[in-house]
Amino acid sequence: MTNNKKLYLYKLSSKAMNYSMDKNERNVLYLNKYLHEYNNKGTKLQNSNMMNSWNNQLYKFNKNEVINTLLTDKLVSKLLVKLFVIKEMGINNPSYLQGSQMGRRIFINRPKFKHTINTVYINFNYNDTNMKMINNKHTLYYGSLIKDINNILGCFNYKNHNNELFNIATYLSGLYNKKVMIMPNKMKYNYNDNVIFNSSISYDLDKYKGGLAGKTYSKLLRDNIPMNNSLSIKNNYMTNIINNNNIKYNNMISNNSLNIKDIYKSFDINKITNELLVNKYLIGLSMLFKGKNIKKAGVSRSIKEKLLFGSLSNKLYRKNSGLLVYKNNNNTTKYLNFDININKKYKLNYMPNHHAISQLSKVNKAKTGVYGISVKLNTI
């Protein structure tokens, strides 16, 4: 039963569905393709047999089983991507959509798999193209479509848990011989995920003249991507540290017999401000376009364009940022150095950089060749 399901996954992930090839031959062809890919990495599988890779977390047991699990994960990943990449959502309801709305698309990041003894967790991010709704009917249609996709996948619900009806989650449970929990995360903005952001840039480039560095598209990026004020981040960070220290201090002086657990009893996860959450603020981003020009056919020379917004380093505070400057009555400038160690006290220059890098290469949209896009996001 499991082998039949795995062969069916190979069939779904096949790109040669229209070829006049026998079903079994096509399955064997793609099975050999994936096996050849892993065999090229060496017999010891240093690149595959890992405890915690970025997209697959699984425990080490048998080498052959690890290979089979990774192959199955890759096939399931292709299946989920095919389900979510919907290029023309209004094809069955043309009265709801007009013009450019016919090209509405859902972008999905590569699913991440976490294997435990009894459960397989599948987590991925997705985002739809940012287009205006025409009317309420379109809004209802889009909402019902996402609901239908969730029902088909059997997505995990924290209230009702998994839908017990036959869906992809139950189908994959029979394939893995474990319970499968699918948990999609809808991104509010495309720049919340570097892979989705990269895909959306490639999707939009051919709509604007001038390419990545053109006035129209670069202005659109600057207007839609927030670059938060580093000074406000510093002040919020310091204020939260001071408030938390005051809570601990008040608990200690109110009762000297308190244990270490009682000192922190006032901290509630629901009360902790979200200003301290990692990856909340987008500090800067860098985009690199390299390859053939999309708009100009017949140009053989490759071009290279790079955009930089904000900063890719979180060391935003200079050495003397803690100094207080004021002027006397005689209009002379003086410095108060009582606050000179503010960076050392609150470790403002020790915030780690969170770089998310995504590369999209060999895109065949250019008439004269291919191009590649690299996106780097820095968050704090």
UniProtKB/Swiss-Prot annotation:
Q: What is the lineage of its organism?
A: Eukaryota, Fungi, Dikarya, Ascomycota, Saccharomycotina
State the function annotated in the UniProt record.
Essential for mitochondrial protein synthesis and required for the maturation of small ribosomal subunits.
Spell out the family assignment given in the record's similarity comment.
Belongs to the universal ribosomal protein uS3 family.
Q: Which gene encodes it?
A: VAR1
Q: What are the entry keywords? A: Mitochondrion, Ribonucleoprotein, Ribosomal protein
Q: Report the protein name in the record.
A: Small ribosomal subunit protein uS3m
State the compartments where it is located. Mitochondrion
Q: State the organism of origin.
A: Cyberlindnera mrakii (Yeast)
> Which Gene Ontology terms of cellular component type are present?
mitochondrion; ribonucleoprotein complex; ribosome
